[in-house]
C-alpha cells in the first residue's frame, strides 16, 4: 500500500482521552438507532456506540488510519463524506462530524450539511466538534500543525450555516472535557500560556474544542 504523504494522526490526542470526552456524545443516541461517523479514524466513537447497542457506520478518507477499526470488526468504509452521502440513500438517526468541518471550504461544508439533512430521519441529530479558535494555543499553534486544515468555524457562523441548511440548533458551546490530551509539549506550556493570554489577549478565553448539536427540522 502506498504511504500517504501526510499523516495527521501524529498530532492526535491519545485514544483514551478521545474515548473519555466523546463518551457523552454517544449517550445522545438510543439502542437500535443508526449513526454515521464521518472521519471515523480507527473507530473509537464507533466502539462507544457499539457498547450502547447503537448501530455505527464509519467512513474515512485515510485507508491508513481506518485499518485498526476494520481489524476490530467495526463497520467502516473507505471514502469521503460528500461522495458517500450522495450515493447512499440510507436514513440515519444521527451523523457525527468530529474534527471534519475545519477541513472543508464553506461551499463544501454547506453541501455536506444539506446532504446530511437529506439523509437524516425526521428529528435526526448532527454533532459537530471542531477546534476552538478562542483557545490561543489552537489559534497560534495546534490548528496549523495539520496541513489539511482549511479554516476555523466559530460558533455564531456554524449556527447560521446549520439553520440555513434546515436544522434547529439544540445546544452549542465549549466542550469542557477538551483542551487536554494534546502532545506533551503543549501541556507543559498550558499554564504559562493561560496566564499570558489572560493578561495580553483577554478575548482568547476558550479552551480546546467547541461543539454544536443540531436537529433536522420536520
What are these regions (language model features)?
Residues 128-149:
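Short, glycine-/aromatic-enriched active-site segment of Class I SAM-dependent methyltransferases
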Residues 150-165:
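Short alpha-helix
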Residues 110-122:
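A short glycine-rich, Lys/Arg-flanked "PGG" loop and its adjoining helix->strand segment in the class I
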Residues 56, 126-128:
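Hydrophobic/aromatic residues located in beta-strands of well-ordered beta-sheets
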Residues 127, 160, 170-218:
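A C-terminal cap/extension of S-adenosyl-L-methionine-dependent methyltransferases
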Residues 98-103:
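Short catalytic micro-motifs in class I SAM-dependent methyltransferases
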Residues 45, 104, 135-138, 179-181:
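Short catalytic/ligand-binding loop motif for oxyanion handling, primarily in non-cytosolic enzymes
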Residues 1-90, 94-96, 108-113, 173-177, ...:
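Conserved N-terminal segment of class I S-adenosyl-L-methionine
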Amino acid at each position: 500500500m502506498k504511504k500517504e504523504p501526510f499523516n495527521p494522526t501524529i498530532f492526535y490526542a491519545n485514544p483514551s482521552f478521545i474515548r473519555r470526552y466523546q463518551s457523552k456524545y454517544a449517550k445522545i443516541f438510543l439502542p437500535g438507532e443508526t449513526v454515521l461517523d464521518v472521519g471515523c479514524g480507527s473507530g473509537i466513537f464507533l466502539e462507544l456506540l457499539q457498547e450502547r447497542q447503537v448501530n455505527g457506520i464509519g467512513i474515512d478518507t485515510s485507508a491508513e488510519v481506518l485499518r485498526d477499526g476494520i481489524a476490530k470488526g467495526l463497520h467502516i468504509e473507505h471514502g469521503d463524506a460528500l461522495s458517500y452521502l450522495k450515493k447512499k440513500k440510507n436514513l440515519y438517526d444521527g451523523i457525527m462530524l468530529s474534527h471534519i468541518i475545519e477541513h472543508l471550504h464553506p461551499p463544501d461544508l454547506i453541501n455536506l450539511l444539506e446532504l446530511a439533512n437529506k439523509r437524516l430521519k425526521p428529528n435526526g441529530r448532527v454533532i459537530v466538534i471542531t477546534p476552538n479558535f478562542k483557545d490561543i494555543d489552537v489559534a497560534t499553534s495546534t490548528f496549523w500543525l495539520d496541513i489539511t486544515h482549511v479554516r476555523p468555524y466559530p460558533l455564531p457562523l456554524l449556527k447560521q450555516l446549520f439553520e440555513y441548511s434546515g436544522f434547529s440548533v439544540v445546544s452549542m458551546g465549549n466542550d469542557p472535557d477538551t483542551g487536554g490530551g494534546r502532545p506533551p509539549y503543549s501541556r507543559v506550556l498550558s499554564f504559562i500560556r493561560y496566564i499570558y493570554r489572560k493578561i495580553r489577549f483577554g478575548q482568547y478565553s476558550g479552551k480546546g474544542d467547541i461543539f454544536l448539536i443540531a436537529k433536522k427540522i420536520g
